[in-house]
Amino acid sequence: LGDVYKRQKWLSPPGGMSSVLFSSESVTSGHPDKLCDAISDAIVDACLTVDCNARVAVETCVKGKEDKGLIVLAGEVSLDGAIPDYEAVARQAAANIGYTSHAIGMDATNPEYCEVQVHITTQSANIAQGVNRDGLDQGAGDQGMMFGYACEETESYNELKGRYFPLAAALSQRLSRRLTTVREEG
């Protein structure tokens, strides 16, 4: 379920420097990192269904073990309304990806073979103080920003045109998406 696919390319930097190997990877939906992201995303969606202004900072950790798989949910949530059943949301997200058999490391549908630990509390007052503002000026709390860069490496390929993305990353992501489609469609 969780394969890693890499694309490598030799680059010759300007200025006469020696060549360097540029590598990029993309993982499929069953990879532990993607599984954790999918579970956390499902929890965010469940909270936003209850309260469209909910603030959710939940981390997920998974571990397949011989005797029993493990999903750990930890974080803070602030919402007005009924608290979602975090365990059920996590189990369903893992099952949707395909973790439904103990033979592959985790059967998220069966509590006998998969333990879910929930350590989610109300958002701390210190973080809430930084984000509880009215109108347009709202703080970011403890959340960070990710960044990348745009380039023209994909512009000479019609099917990738307009992405302005590093070619190695675009190809590895495309391969991962196709493998996921093939797995899901059988």
Question: What does each model-identified segment do?
Answer:
Residues S23-V27, V62-L70, A95-G186:
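Glycine-rich, mobile lid/loop segments that gate access to catalytic sites or pores
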Residues V58-D80:
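Short, charge-patterned binding micro-sites
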Residues V77-G98:
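Active-site-surrounding "flap" and adjacent substrate/cofactor-binding loops of secreted or lumenal enzymes
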Residues L48-V62, P84-E87, H102-G105:
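Short N-terminal amphipathic alpha-helices
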Residues H31-K34, Y86-E87, N126-A128:
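N-terminal low-complexity, intrinsically disordered segments
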Residues L1-Y5:
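Short, small-residue-biased leader/transition segments that mark boundaries at the very start
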Residues W10, P14-A57:
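N-terminal, positively charged regions that mediate nucleic acid binding
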